[in-house]
């Protein structure tokens, strides 16, 4: 991070809440502009450099981890009635379990069991076989959008809980277990790791999160490549201010049904 960037951060902090909100809004807009113009990654640092640039200190990382777990545990208790209602709705809507568990890749490339509500039919592979059988080349993967608007695999309740992000609520279990953070790049499936470039693997140097800069700015409407670019920006510039901005922005996104990026 340049001295000028640090100076802007200090100026915003001195300006009070309004300055902080304005700084975050400008940051988010700048991020979207750079994605649109393809200006991300023009001079990427080394993989170890990503670890140095992030503005959390080692002590800050520990505090963040404790806060994540405490807030996630409190959140699970607070929303337990909602979890029960969603689980019952899923079971009544289609055969199969209420929860979906899948292996995802976490910090330092370690696999973990990922929890979310099931939003698809249990025979999803049979309903959309071409998605699983087709062999994409690297360029096709970079341009993929992984949530097609008319997906035959998704149930009626699944469409609702995906649109409202209720399907992600069980991710709080992963935060309590220490596999995930509240904010961070979304955890990847093992099959897509070969498509990550060397620099993009820096995304795995931090814990994956329930929400992310990419989810906030693009929700499900940006490509695999654009998601990676935003994840890399988060790894490079993450801080308490950014995490709070992403959290509050996510609440706004869920409430309005729109991403910050439009």
Enumerate the predicted regions with their spans.
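N-terminal hydrophobic signal-anchor/signal peptide
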Residues: 1-79, 201, 234-236, 260-262
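Short, glycine-rich, amphipathic interfacial segments at transmembrane boundaries or analogous
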Residues: 40, 99-152, 211-229
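Hydrophobic alpha-helical segments characteristic of transmembrane helices
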Residues: 43-45, 169-176, 216-219
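A hydrophobic, helix-centered structural microdomain
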Residues: 55-127, 240, 245-262
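Short, solvent-exposed loop/helix junctions and linker helices
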Residues: 56, 60-64, 147-151, 162-166, ...
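A short, structured surface patch at a secondary-structure boundary
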Residues: 140-207, 247-253
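Cytosol-/stroma-facing membrane-proximal "stalk/adaptor" domains immediately downstream
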Residues: 190-208, 213-215, 219-246, 254, ...
